[in-house]
Amino acid sequence: WQLPYIKAISQHHQTNIDLIVREKTQAQNILKDLKHINQIFYNDFRKGIFYWLDVFKLKKIFDTEKYDYVYILDKVNKPAIAAKLSGIQNIIAPGIKNQKKWITSKNYLNEDDWNLNYSEQSQKFLKINSIKLNDKFPSLEIDTERLKQGNDDLLVKGKKIAFGVD
């Protein structure tokens, strides 16, 4: 659901971008053919003692990759804290609740925006940061030749039915 907003940020900066997501998203496999994504890192978003381990894992990624901008499309604090610890000058996020302590952007959502759904929050977030959104609908690019390799189970003749839930 965040794909249109990720693409808009890529187009805004005229560069391919890196993503950091939970491993359970399987993004390295599912999103590998999207041309506006450079590379995908996995990081957990856990609580308790693991919270700080995850922050320092993010910091290591930020230090290694030397990003100029970190965009966060959710209310989470970990990437903002890690970016701040890494000295990143442009930390841009919705700024909901405590997150605004860690971001550098002065344009963030207000507390009433917390009641919007995630897509509406992201759309408003882009708008207040002057990022043009060309298409609100997510789309995937799939290299079908690559998909055929090692996926014989998907190449079944006849009807196939898929059911997806979140």
What are these regions (language model features)?
Residues W1-D166:
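Catalytic machinery of carbohydrate-active enzymes
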